[in-house]
Amino acid sequence: ASRSQAEDVRVEGAFPVTMLPGDGVGPELMAAVGVIECLKLGDGLFLQCCEEVAELYPKNIANPTATLLASCMMLDHLKTSDMGGYATCQDFTEAVIGALSHP
C-alpha cells in the first residue's frame, strides 16, 4: 500500500529532512533530542517534540529552540500571497492567533 502525504511526518533540524511513517514513531524517537521540530503535513499540525519542557519549566532551564523552530515552520507553511501562498494578511494573522489560543 502506498502512503499519502498525509501519512508522512517531515522532520527538520540538525539532520537532513527525513520522511517517517505517520504512525507516531517520529515524535517519540526525537523527544529525547529536544531541539527538533516537525510538521505533520497532512493536517498542518506543528509539533515541538520536547516533552521534557514541562518538567524543566519550573526550573527555568527548558530549551525553547524546538518551540521556536516549530513556530517558524508554521509561519513558513501559512504563506501569504506575496510568498506564493493564498492567505491574506488577515487570514495569516487569524491563523497565528488561533494557533496561539489553542496549544
From Swiss-Prot:
Lineage: Eukaryota, Metazoa, Chordata, Craniata, Vertebrata
GO aspect biological process, one term: tricarboxylic acid cycle
Record keyword Oxidoreductase present: no
Residues that span the membrane, as ranges: none
Subcellular location, principal: mitochondrion
Quaternary structure note: Heterooligomer of subunits alpha (IDH3A), beta (IDH3B), and gamma (IDH3G) in the apparent ratio of 2:1:1. The heterodimer containing one IDH3A and one IDH3B subunit and the heterodimer containing one IDH3A and one IDH3G subunit assemble into a heterotetramer (which contains two subunits of IDH3A, one of IDH3B and one of IDH3G) and further into the heterooctamer.
Keywords tagged on the record: Mitochondrion, Tricarboxylic acid cycle
Domain of life: Eukaryota
Similarity comment: Belongs to the isocitrate and isopropylmalate dehydrogenases family.
Species this protein is from: Sus scrofa
GO terms of molecular function: enzyme activator activity
Activity control summary: The heterotetramer and the heterodimer composed of IDH3A and IDH3G subunits can be allosterically activated by citrate (CIT) or/and ADP, and the two activators can act independently or synergistically. The heterodimer composed of IDH3A and IDH3B subunits cannot be allosterically regulated and the allosteric regulation of the heterotetramer is through the IDH3G subunit and not the IDH3B subunit.
Disulphide bond pairs: none
Name of the protein in its database record: Isocitrate dehydrogenase [NAD] subunit beta, mitochondrial
Keyword Cytoplasm tagged: no
